[in-house]
Curated annotation (Swiss-Prot):
Organism this protein belongs to: Bacillus subtilis (strain 168)
Catalytic reaction list: N(6)-(1,2-dicarboxyethyl)-AMP = fumarate + AMP; (2S)-2-[5-amino-1-(5-phospho-beta-D-ribosyl)imidazole-4-carboxamido]succinate = 5-amino-1-(5-phospho-beta-D-ribosyl)imidazole-4-carboxamide + fumarate
Effect recorded for H141Q: Abolishes enzyme activity
Pfam families named in the record: ADSL_C, Lyase_1
Assembly information from the UniProt record: Homotetramer. Residues from neighboring subunits contribute catalytic and substrate-binding residues to each active site.
Disulfide-bonded cysteines: none
Binding-site residues for N(6)-(1,2-dicarboxyethyl)-AMP, renumbered to this chain: 4-5, 67-69, 93-94, 212, 263, 268-270, 276, 307-311
Protein name in UniProt: Adenylosuccinate lyase
Documented effect of changing H89Q: Abolishes enzyme activity
Gene (name only): purB
GO CC annotation: cytosol
Task of the protein: Catalyzes two reactions in de novo purine nucleotide biosynthesis. Catalyzes the breakdown of 5-aminoimidazole- (N-succinylocarboxamide) ribotide (SAICAR or 2-[5-amino-1-(5-phospho-beta-D-ribosyl)imidazole-4-carboxamido]succinate) to 5-aminoimidazole-4-carboxamide ribotide (AICAR or 5-amino-1-(5-phospho-beta-D-ribosyl)imidazole-4-carboxamide) and fumarate, and of adenylosuccinate (ADS or N(6)-(1,2-dicarboxyethyl)-AMP) to adenosine monophosphate (AMP) and fumarate. Influences the affinity of glutamyl--tRNA ligase for its substrates and increases its thermostability.
Amino acid sequence: MIERYSRPEMSAIWTDENRFQAWLEVEILACEAWAELGVIPKEDVKVMRENASFDINRILEIEKDTRHDVVAFTRAVSESLGEERKWVHYGLTSTDVVDTALSYLLKQANDILLKDLERFVDIIKEKAKEHKYTVMMGRTHGVHAEPTTFGLKLALWHEEMKRNLERFKQAKAGIEVGKISGAVGTYANIDPFVEQYVCEKLGLKAAPISTQTLQRDRHADYMATLALIATSIEKFAVEIRGLQKSETREVEEFFAKGQKGSSAMPHKRNPIGSENMTGMARVIRGYMMTAYENVPLWHERDISHSSAERIILPDATIALNYMLNRFSNIVKNLTVFPENMKRNMDRTLGLIYSQRVLLALIDTGLTREEAYDTVQPKAMEAWEKQVPFRELVEAEEKITSRLSPEKIADCFDYNYHLKNVDLIFERLGLA
């Protein structure tokens, strides 16, 4: 991932240095397991633990000849050792090291993402409680529907992110799995104890069965979860973008002193952070499709997945780490304009209360069709003539003969629509 969208802690996980260090840890742990079984002398393993090292430039130099990165790595490590070098990679195949180390790196990345998600959920929760009763227009198909609150909108986001948090925990468990089962998964040249030992030391589970590789449905599921989280963030960001339009201006991203919105137009205050979220989500969703393409490998393995995963797994975790942190700050510092929300509610001249009038007429004994046919012409007239809907209702004898002035006034009270806000918040555990 390019530096612009990278945060140091996450990026550090995916450096060549950290990747090779993970490979080395798998190699040494495997030797420790062999020592427990009495195959490798414990003194040799002690020396390996103390002295085994690598030089990245040397690995790359060797790889020019071997055209195999793991062989280059093991040779470079062997050069740092004495007689005990013969135990490097003992009984292992390349993917025993690579796949197990990859899962270990993903575990490191997951620990960061989990904290990011939990922080984001908490930020949305506090913002929802702050705006629990901030009344605003609910829109369906982009058209004014009925009143809601900004707090309810945020509470919806909070509940969605709680689901994403649970999905992530499940995907985390599914991907934090290692395998050291040999060339085709039969443990022909490796004792299953070695796999169990290494995985336990790394905080991974051992795959119940594998071929030369871990099966890539795990990685596809993991990437799908990252993509869904990114898409939820995009969904929220698109909402902010819509509400920040000049003709709406119900919310606005924080605009810092000295910030510029346009090179040409000094007045511009654009929702660039939210727009950025949309672009980043597109990238992660694209990576998800690549992960799905990686599932059908040939027989017990091929390496068609390898080149893709070197890109998509680091990039996706780095990108989501960036998204979660940037959008958390956008929500936390979001400027909300309650007066604009109320002003926008009035722009449709009371049409948002049409259902209340409809139901009130039904309560007097009209059929639904009769009530609808009575109210709709008045609503259409309000649209077309830009006349307050309430005035037309109060002038319509078919309505006033059934509804008292007090009842009509009651139909146009937005507080009616907020009567269950407390109940919804309690149901969500946000009270």
